[in-house]
Amino acid sequence: YRMILGEDPVLQVNLGRDVATAPWMLVCVPMGIAAALLGHGFVRGLLATRRWAKAVTALPAGLLPGLGGLACGLVGTLAYVWTGAFGQPEHGVFSIGYESLGAAFDAGLVWQAMAILLVGKVIAVLICYATGGSGGLFSPTLFIGGMLGGLFGIGLAGVDTLLPIFRDTTTAHIMGASVLLGMGALFAAVIRCPFTSLVIIFEMTRDYSLILPLMIGNMIAYYLAGRLQPVPLYNALLLQDGINLRRMPAYQGARDYRNLPVSTIMTYDVVAVDA
């Protein structure tokens, strides 16, 4: 990762090494709960949208991704226009969203812009992934979690002005820490890899100030998401495609290629187009 993109962090957090951990040990609890609920809704929506898209058989195979791309473009354009109405035009729905995340880390986004980006990104990802468009779920999940954390941060900053909780901490520090916790918690809830999100966030930010709150928030989100949706996302996607990993033959080392029937991995719904 660093050999390709360089040693500089992708996202600048600038929390400082003297950040107080104790208040964030409390904040990570509701953050983890909120991330679990949002992640559960996101996974359910993704599976439902994909199920609907697979049921659409009246359209040619190559037309559905095109319509999905058109819909994503419309959602991204609306998000850009609506965030611009608040003086902060953001194109985070179109791109990976590092610029918008960086602005959220620096307390540079109003809550309306973050709410628009969160909702717009969720809708765009559901449409794009369900219709067979390009792209994955890792970066969008981090982006959505960052916007969730940013909304938390604005609320915490407002509370801190009335009842000081964070000593010697600026609004930018509160926002940066909240965005960081939100990214990790939602990733753990959706992808079900709580420690992988720690590594990804550390690699992207080069900041290790909130290790314990991140771990606790991730584990809370991971546990609650598992209770709400026992089948992980990628397992559920395989089940939608008719692949059940539990029914595959047991691993037999070097003999696997001889004993594994082709029918366990082949697809019967072949899409063919005229050359």
Protein language model regions, located:
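Alpha-helical transmembrane segments and immediately membrane-proximal extracytoplasmic
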Residues: 1-275
